[in-house]
């Protein structure tokens, strides 16, 4: 019985940690993101790699792959400023790498754009191409 109780406690803890991690970086909707872009109150981080970044990115996004060593220099001074990371699509979790790095620098308003570049393109929104 003690083993069973210990197993249940362990499973419960694991599930609660997984659930907490899932919402660690809340999603931002397409309309919220475009409003923040229009107001110029967001820093966007593309986590798709440099080749993908040059092939098409959300306008104004920075390339995480080229900034890893100097990410802090590309971010706003205000640690409460909105920072949004995105990757390929809704199934992609690569955004977490950048989001965690940003949070580790002390930023408190870190979100992710779940549809990623695929969803952005599917919405008909413009993309930037080439080097920044």
Model-identified regions with their sequence ranges:
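Rhodanese-like catalytic fold shared by cysteine-dependent sulfurtransferases
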Residues: 2-6, 15-27, 31, 54-85, ...
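Short coil/turn segments at beta-strand junctions that form active-site/ligand-binding loops
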Residues: 40-44, 79-81
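Extracytoplasmic/periplasm-facing segments of secreted or lipoprotein envelope proteins
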Residues: 29, 36-41
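Short hydrophobic beta-strand that contains or immediately precedes a catalytic carboxylate
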Residues: 43-48, 61
